[in-house]
Amino acid sequence: MSATIEIQNDIALIRMDDGKANAINFEMVAALNETLDKAEAGAKAIVLAGREGRFSGGFDLKAFASLGPEGVYKLLDAGAELLLRLYGGPLPVVAACTGHAIAMGVFILNACDTRVGASGDYKIGANEAVTGMNLPIFAMELSRDRLSPQHLTRAMIQGFIYDPAGAVEAGYLDMLSEPDKVEATALAVAGQLAQLPGKAYAWNKKSIRKGTLDRIKASLGAHHKL
């Protein structure tokens, strides 16, 4: 499985691990949606983690090369719908950024409520400007919401890649932990968030983010128009 789930003490720990870059393809999206179904049914908060040294390298470029334009648009929409689920879903979501997070990997971070990152020699950022790709609407909207305004141009238009400390300053991460403690730290944060009244958390989260959520929803199926 490319994503697994364990639920203990009302906290769902979801791990992405495809043995490689944790690339986002249809298989990974389906696996994550399945784990989120289980989390929403049986937990009060979620921790989303990668594997050691790697959170996610972004969309699966091999899949992009083989899918053709329409298939690529469908994968982009599937990724956008996953981000909508994380960003607008009812449960607190804490990211345990265990290593490199690139492109779609950082947009997943942006969709999580609190982001705990591993300190160390890791790369975090959106490289679309460097690789010559247009940013999807969901990437722009989430970045406007979560990144520091002072870093938005550098991060999203110029494709700057940050180290973990710089990622905190830019707004990709909220805090750092030692690499061997990042998952435990994220679980502790999730445990604290799970104590908050769940209905109010869900309502406030969705209401405050409604504008961003609506703009992303409106972009589904329209990537070819960018």
What is the role of each PLM region?
Residues 84, 106-107, 140, 153, ...:
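Alpha-helical segments flanking ligand/cofactor-binding loops in enzyme cores
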Residues 83-131:
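Glycine-rich beta-to-alpha active-site loop
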Residues 1-49, 84:
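Conserved CoA-thioester-binding segment of acyl-CoA-metabolizing enzymes
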Residues 114, 154, 158-160, 166, ...:
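Well-ordered beta-strand positions
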Residues 30-31, 42, 50-82:
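Glycine- (often His-adjacent) and acidic-residue-rich active-site loop
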Residues 48, 108-110, 167, 186:
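Hydrophobic/aromatic residues within transmembrane alpha-helices
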Residues 116-122, 168, 173-220:
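C-terminal long alpha-helix characteristic of the crotonase
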Residues 139-150:
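Hydrophobic, secondary-structure "cap" segments at the distal end of domains
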